[in-house]
From Swiss-Prot:
Lineage start: Archaea, Methanobacteriati, Methanobacteriota, Methanomada group, Methanococci
Transmembrane segments: 1-21, 27-47, 49-69
Cross-referenced Pfam families: NiFe_hyd_3_EhaA (PF17367)
Function recorded in the entry: One of the integral membrane subunits of multisubunit membrane-bound [NiFe]-hydrogenase eha. Eha is predicted to form large electron transfer complex and might catalyze energy-driven reduction of low-potential redox carriers.
The organism of origin for this protein: Methanococcus maripaludis (strain DSM 14266 / JCM 13030 / NBRC 101832 / S2 / LL)
Entry similarity comment: Belongs to the EhaA family.
Subcellular location: Cell membrane
The name this protein goes by in its record: Probable [NiFe]-hydrogenase-type-3 Eha complex membrane subunit A
Record membrane topology: Multi-pass membrane protein
């Protein structure tokens, strides 16, 4: 039960911080731009599972994971720039 609470806290904090950062709420299927609904919750749940497996989880670390996931999703295009298709 505690693990589910940690997942929920991480998920909610990622969505709230993503909304505060000004990310779009809806996502476009033809775009690689991140939004609050994709990939932010999936990054948060994945990081929570990874940290929970490697290290122990508590509420503070779940909140920190949620904040990190939303900031990572916000700046993904700057961290991993796209490929130019210019052949010239």
């Amino acid at each position: 039960m505690v693990l589910l609470i940690n997942y929920a806290v991480s998920l909610v904090s990622a969505i709230v911080v993503g909304a505060v950062l000004g990310m779009k709420l809806s996502f476009d299927m033809d775009s690689f731009e991140g939004s609050v609904l994709f990939p932010t919750p999936f990054v948060a749940i994945g990081l929570t599972a990874l940290i929970g497996y490697l290290i122990t989880l508590d509420l503070v670390s779940s909140i920190i994971i949620g904040i990190f996931a939303s900031v990572f999703s916000k700046f993904t295009n700057k961290i991993f720039p796209g490929v130019n298709n210019d052949i010239n």
